[in-house]
Amino acid sequence: MAKFRVRVSTGEACGAGTWDKVSVSIVGTHGESPLVPLDHLGKEFSAGAEEDFEVTLPQDVGTVLMLRIHKAPPEAPLPLLSFPPDAWYCRWFELEWLPGAALRFPCYQWLEGAGELVLREGAAKVSWQDHHRTLQDQRQKELESRKDMYSWKTYIEGWPHCLDHETVKDLDLNIKYSAMKNAKFFFKAQSAFTELKFKGLLDRTGLWRSLREMKRMFNFHNTPAAEYVFAHWQEDAFFASQFLNGLNPVLIRRCRRLPENFPVTDEMVAPVLGPGTSLQAELEKGSLFLVDHGILSGVQTNVINGKPQFSAAPMTLLYQSPGSGPLLPIAIQLKQTPGPDNPIFLPSDDKWDWLLAKTWVRNAEFSIHEALTHLLHAHLIPEVFALATLRQLPHCHPLFKLLIPHTRYTLHINTLARELLIAPGKVVDKSTGLGIGGFSDLIKRNMEQLSYSVLCLPEDIRARDVGDLPGYYYRDDGMQIWSAIRSFVSEIVDIYYPSDASVRDDQELQAWVGEIFSEGFLSQESSGMPSLLDTQEALVQYVTMVIFTCSAKHAAVSASQFDSCVWMPNLPPSMQLPPPTSKGQASPEGFIATLPAVNATCDVIIALWLLSKEPGDRRPLGHYPDEHFTEEVPRRSIAAFQRKLIQISSGIRKRNQSLALPYTYLDPPLIENSVSI
């Protein structure tokens, strides 16, 4: 006879409790016990409850290895009646055989319908640490089950592969939005559509009548940052600052030599550079910077409301003023091939010529940001990380425990995006200048150029040579967060991987990395993405990159969308007239005629409003309410990580007090753990 106290914790979410009957068997080194019902008077397993059950086994099972949880509908009172099984969210089981001697079995999963679930004791273990055959078999069966549940598909040829489900209705509860988050998301969407339809804007296919009329749209849920954009969008210094701290802060690079297809001369830029210097001198000093949107050259464009749309592939040269002066644009060329029909626009040109040129650059920023920086780098690639984690790492694996909070809701939001945003005829196709055809072109082109170093912030900053560019808060805050994540990851890796050989010998880890390489990066060796990891250092770098991409990188390029775009002339999603081929032709009327139609503007701004702010049920970076790690040592590392994030946040908020436009997108409490919106 063996006696145990079993404590069960049910989640607090809406619908987490169950009327179903739950039984447990205990698996040990000497065998497995019969199923024992967890039952007492009254209802068990209510939402938020922790309940104790006394369990007596007929025989000793030896050292406890795992629990087998069985759930089934209650018996019907009449033979012809039956109860449909309902879902149950279990947080954990705890098994105590002596006072103070207890084992915790983390679950943090929904159990849908009738069936069973196996829970391991909470200590994290890599595969080579499991010596008992029962535990080895359990790891293998768990992964086989998850591979059946979560499979890959090709959505568009040349894109990273994705989850093979058509709609969010097909998803199981473990990867689906909570009921609260889902309700808030769709209420927010419906209220936005209703407001703009009431204003008579949502169905108008014509041009805006004036910038003044656009102000009606601007009042749509604007923010302090959006107010600043509205007040300063025409200013050169603000235009330049958006390359540093706007929604796409990843393109600007130092220019040591002018591209041959960008023939800027000393005479062109002398009014900005001033006397006593030259282009060559400033190139050598390192005070010139380049933003090149050349990947847009020749990209497929869209037709909106029956009208063809247009795109440019601009190059922008910027000058960092000496001392504490601002970064300023000094030359813009709208196409990649120089010639008489491709003038270089300058700040000294007519006001409307220069403003129109800058607006073409901002349209290019929209296209590259939405297709590449946001969709590809901050959604499709994190989906690969999430899906490979579910398929290749069992729950007891330390990397699963570390990474699973950073995959929360990613598969839901990406499936929803394929339903409502990037599917043919949906928002991207209806209302952006490139449409899904142009987005697809860009993603395929970028996949051929994408490198591992671009995903690793320190290497990316070095490659672009922007480590000392003043006022680059994305870099400053991002590097602090990267360092904090890396320190945390390094501590976790040191706990479970004592040597380089232990990394090489972890076959589950190698399968995880290999699947990311093949399914996400399409086995392109030119990307520099590892297909295996053979050192502790390589593992730390790789996992840091995964967590940073899924949290901070996504926050930086997602949360800023609405602020940048609600005043549409600052970030037009499409352009209805071709880029100018000469100077002196621009006018206020021509400027308005170039901007997107009213309905296209509304569609995009609603989408960006939804995608910029989390609709409740948030989990900020470093917030881990699901306690997958049960050992004291990794829990101390988590606490240290959380303290570091608080320190970083304090510094950011202190700095922001002195800024006219605070940079808040990488303030840790505002960063979500995962790509969930």
From Swiss-Prot:
Key word Oxidoreductase present: yes
GO CC entries: adherens junction; cytoskeleton; cytosol; focal adhesion; membrane; plasma membrane
Annotated keywords: Calcium, Cell junction, Cell membrane, Cytoplasm, Cytoskeleton, Dioxygenase, Iron, Lipid metabolism, Lipid-binding, Membrane, Metal-binding, Nucleus, Oxidoreductase
Cofactor(s) for this UniProt protein: Fe cation
Cofactor binding, per record: Binds 1 Fe cation per subunit.
Enzyme class, first EC level, given as a word: oxidoreductase
One GO-annotated biological process of the protein: linoleic acid metabolic process
Top-rank taxon, per record: Eukaryota
Matches recorded under SMART domains: LH2
Binding positions for Ca(2+) 1 per the UniProt entry: 15, 17, 86-87
Family: Belongs to the lipoxygenase family.
Protein name in UniProt: Polyunsaturated fatty acid lipoxygenase ALOX15B
Organism: Rattus norvegicus
Biological classification of the source: Eukaryota, Metazoa, Chordata, Craniata, Vertebrata
UniProt gene name: Alox15b
